């Protein structure tokens, strides 16, 4: 490798390292939903989590994923009755079955009654109660095919573990668009019926 190529490699490596650091710093600064891990299978990247209640801003997606994101982003960036700016949180949640819906979690400081009225009638709200869910994590780009592949993995795992699925899966994406693929954090999450057998490890065969 000649000198020019070596210098180019150093520049690219330094740039990637800088982007990785910025992506990590940005991710660490964003509020995420509160939960506790009830059980984990680290080799499978699967967890059973107990989530606290939270308020979600939601919209039905009529076109692309980006359309839903822009509608919700418009609301938190001041498109509301008081022109109030609301902090961005993670993850951005997207339904994988039934009606095509996207949701932003509202910061924990907000109760439903505290949120300003949206300017855009396509923005609505949901109060999500406390619930238990199974979660599988993966990195890279969360294309429809990759999301479905990981959902099928999670579903088959839950069947093998004799864990009852109690709702529809959603895709959770935690990172801004410029995050490098290998640093991206994605999850498929599905509500389950929690039992003492699951917590003790006596359900299923693993």
Q: What is each model feature region?
A:
Residues 2-206:
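A solvent-exposed interaction/effector surface
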